[in-house]
Amino acid sequence: MFGCFFIMSYLKERIKHAVRFRHKRGYGVHSPFMFNLILNAIRDKEKQYTYPENIEKRDGLGHRKKKEFRLLSRLTRYLKVNSVTCFGVGAPRIGNYLKAMEPGADIQVNGGTLPPEVDFIYLGRGFQQYLPADLEREILFAAGGKRRCIVITDIYKSRQAGRLWRQGRERATVCLDMMWYGILLFDEKLQKGRYNLII
């Protein structure tokens, strides 16, 4: 019974994204910050970023993983983050990749605590195994007044990721639903908004 509901929910979201693809090009986005984020960081229209291709080859990243790693790299650079925390099965690889891109950033992988100054959190596939239950609440509820970006993967595949996504969406200033990933931005200076993109 739940499997059928989950499949129908997934298909409904795919159709919704196909209909609302306009945000991918920046159409209908009225916030200048979000317009620039979508075009210059998420899409990289100007091809202004370089990537550590030696690490991509060494780690044997497939096309989808390479897109994910590059997206995270562009986000951390565009948002000028100082502290990154990653949870998930592939978190060590992502941590190494981001460290190569941002040598000055403090990067923590599958840690048991959340540094108070963290401004970028990545919850990857299988983050449930590494994320203590008390930290799950702290990630969303401590973000209140702080400038923070949270990226959650598999928001329509994993029950726990979907629950976190829905809870975070209610509290976040801006949420970007990218079908495979959800990006939550907490920043009181930003204009509130919800966007649907597929890259």
Give, region by region, the residue ranges found by the protein language model.
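A short alpha-helical cap/connector motif
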Residues: 1-146, 156-199
